[in-house]
Amino acid sequence: MAISRLLVEKFRNLTAVDLDFDPCFNFLIGNNGSGKTSLLEAIFYLGHGRSFKSAVTNRIISYDEPHFTLFGQIQESQHQWSIGLQKLRQGNTLVKINGEDGNKISDLAHLLPMQLITPEGLTLLNGGPSYRRAFLDWGLFHHQTSFYSAWSNLNRLLKQRNAALAQNQPYSAIKIWDVELAKLAHQVSEWRAEYAEALSPEIEQTCQLFLPELEINVSFHQGWEKNADYYEILQQNFERDRALNYTFSGPQKADFRFKAQGLPVEDVLSRGQLKLLMCALRLAQGEHLMKEKQRHCIFLIDDFASELDQYKRALLAERLQQSGSQVFVTAITQRQLKEMQVENKKMFSVHNGIINALN
């Protein structure tokens, strides 16, 4: 999958953008605040219907404008699509695929599998379990066709159950939801466990390349006692859940944990090592998608050079090139990209929201 053309209007500080991209590497060069991260954000938004920088729409739409518009032409093998997204200041989102209305953001997400590597992305390792659940669920969204429907229904039932608990309703009023909730919980957990098991060897292998001095181990935890029946857990813990006003145990508490030398990685690794581990996770997941589904991710890498020495930057560049994926990389100077010795590339300068091709 690759974006061949991108149009951006009224998005942050970017002047109207109309760019053609290389299917391999695209480098965005500019000072801090110039708009290069905003372009990555626009690409990410086109594939996710949300920002990785802000949840507040009014901060993303250009000042005094009613909406922003994103349009992309994408291609994969012999197939081509035209996709568009418009976000209104009052919150509505309009999605078009090949000129047709009525599409969902999930349709865009399926067309554009993306891996994001940013300085803030270390929350995957040192943040709460929700970040690691999202990592697993991203993979399942692209690998298991029934996952998104099951995941959506699971979250809907959990919200309904929690609302009933907060209203102090008796178990007789909640029991009807618990049967279906338990069924979905077991299915989602089974998928997560299978995906984690399939991905773990690739993660550990990639970690050996980036962090050979460490032994990295991964493990999946489903969010309730292993081998226990979740329906029985819901029954047994009803009074506790009602006192808490929410469902304490379940797939909403699942985690995908990483340890180095037997200890949590956030307690052992330096910030630079954590970034390398994050890169290893994203690369392994993208390569797993290619191996299993013959689909390439698009990699978005913000501030490529930060916290990586010259050797590790060269290693990351080589692995990205081997992946065959389309890659977007930001840097302050071309010098920071000297390890990116690639034949197929385009270079862009970014200054005060204006983006120009350099080659």
UniProtKB/Swiss-Prot annotation:
GO terms for cellular component: cytoplasm. The gene is recF. This is DNA replication and repair protein RecF. InterPro entries: DNA-binding_RecF, DNA-binding_RecF_CS, P-loop_NTPase, RecF/RecN/SMC_N, RecF_2. It holds the Pfam family SMC_N. GO terms for biological process: DNA replication; DNA synthesis involved in DNA repair; double-strand break repair; SOS response. The RecF protein is involved in DNA metabolism; it is required for DNA replication and normal SOS inducibility. RecF binds preferentially to single-stranded, linear DNA. It also seems to bind ATP. SUPFAM superfamilies: P-loop containing nucleoside triphosphate hydrolases (SSF52540). The keyword rRNA processing does not apply. ATP binds at G30, N31, N32, G33, S34, G35, K36, T37. Keywords: ATP-binding, Cytoplasm, DNA damage, DNA repair, DNA replication, DNA-binding, Nucleotide-binding, SOS response. HAMAP family: RecF. Its main location: cytoplasm. One of its GO terms (molecular function) is single-stranded DNA binding.
